[in-house]
């Protein structure tokens, strides 16, 4: 008997592989980025977060508004799902505007911000800004400063924006700090910069933000890009970030392309280094290309302190629920 496969077997293998590739491509372009939505839960145990201060935080990252992948109806679904989780606090981690050119209808912040204002939590909803929010504002790029369009729209919708700012909140009489960092990649290289290595410039001020936390109450830091994490001191119990989209393509815990100088180190999920905790959301939308594979759009829920009941009993029936 020949050791070589028959022609029929060879053709079946080739055609089957081709069908798998076509199907995977259709899923990555048409299904996962536009229709899937999961709840991703984390239960970190930061050393400097008191166990008797239970906190249920919902984090929304990288909406990247724009049809057909992120229409306003999809945002309404995300808002309704988040509200149904009944979080104590909601945080928006930046990148609200479209991140690629594959849009059939552009949707501005003036339309998106009122939808986000429908988010409900006892301790409120707080936002930071992302690099795409800055890059989309040509006036801000020309002037090398804000406030940018996204910040003004959120402000007009009564959604507070923290840009190198700290706010002191309290739950059940126990205080904590919420710190919002300015974007680390906000300013594109000037057009007249013709030679040399072109560098993006940030508007972040970590030291100035930390200095506003004037007592020893525990602190949570919102930072759009996770690359700041090595500089975050133990003073901060938890850092929440977005930006990476988990690489948009993620297989077996590995992302081939991650928009971070650290590669897969901070690509996605819960990271603990030197007893410091970071959670990186995979976000909701897409940038560069409208592709997601292995990292579905997600709403992140962070369960701090004494943990709540299982998330399956709290999430609505539609979106997928997962725990981590």
Predicted regions and their residues:
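N-terminal secretory signal peptides and thylakoid transit peptides that target proteins
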Residues: 1-21
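C-terminal segment of N-terminal export signals and the immediately downstream linker at the start
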Residues: 22-58, 77-80
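Beta-strand-turn-beta hairpins that frame and shape the catalytic cleft
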Residues: 46-57, 166-178, 272-277
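Active-site-proximal beta-strand elements of phosphoester/diester hydrolases
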Residues: 54-64, 175-185, 220-223, 277-283
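Membrane-embedded segments
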Residues: 56-152, 156-160
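Active-site neighborhood of phospho(di)ester-bond hydrolases with catalytic His/Asp-centered motifs
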Residues: 60-61, 90-95, 125-131, 162-164, ...
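Binuclear metal-dependent hydrolase catalytic cores centered on His/Asp/Glu-rich metal-binding motifs
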Residues: 137-159, 171-219, 229, 292
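Conserved beta-sheet core of the metallophosphoesterase superfamily
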Residues: 220, 225-303, 308-310
């Amino acid at each position: 008997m020949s050791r070589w496969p028959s022609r029929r077997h060879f053709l079946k293998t080739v055609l089957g592989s081709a069908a798998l590739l076509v199907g995977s491509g259709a899923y990555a372009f048409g299904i996962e980025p536009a229709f899937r939505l999961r709840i991703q839960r984390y239960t970190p145990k930061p050393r400097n977060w008191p166990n008797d201060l239970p906190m249920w935080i919902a984090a929304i990252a990288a909406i990247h508004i724009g049809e057909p992948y992120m229409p306003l109806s999809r945002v309404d679904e995300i808002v309704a799902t988040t509200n149904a989780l009944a979080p104590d606090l909601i945080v928006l981690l930046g990148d609200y505007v479209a991140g690629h050119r594959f849009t059939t209808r552009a949707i501005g912040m003036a339309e998106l911000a009122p939808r986000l204002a429908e988010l409900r939590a006892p301790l409120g909803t707080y936002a930071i800004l992302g690099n795409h929010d800055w890059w989309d504002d040509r006036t801000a790029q020309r002037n090398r400063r804000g406030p940018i369009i996204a910040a003004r729209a959120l402000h007009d919708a009564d959604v507070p924006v923290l840009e190198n700012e700290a706010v002191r909140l309290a739950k059940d009489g126990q205080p904590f700090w919420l710190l919002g960092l300015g974007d680390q990649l906000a300013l594109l290289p000037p057009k007249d910069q013709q030679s040399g290595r072109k560098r993006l410039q940030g508007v972040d001020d970590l030291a100035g933000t930390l200095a506003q936390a004037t007592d020893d109450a525990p602190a949570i830091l919102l930072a759009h890009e996770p690359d700041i994490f090595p500089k975050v001191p133990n003073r901060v119990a938890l850092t929440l970030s977005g930006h990476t989209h988990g690489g948009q393509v993620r297989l077996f815990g590995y992302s081939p392309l991650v928009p971070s100088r650290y590669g897969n180190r901070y690509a996605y999920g819960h990271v603990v280094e030197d007893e410091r905790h970071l959670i990186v959301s995979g976000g909701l939308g897409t940038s560069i290309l409208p592709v997601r594979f292995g990292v579905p759009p997600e709403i992140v829920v962070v369960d701090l302190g004494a943990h709540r009941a299982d998330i399956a009993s709290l999430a609505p029936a539609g979106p997928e629920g997962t725990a981590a």
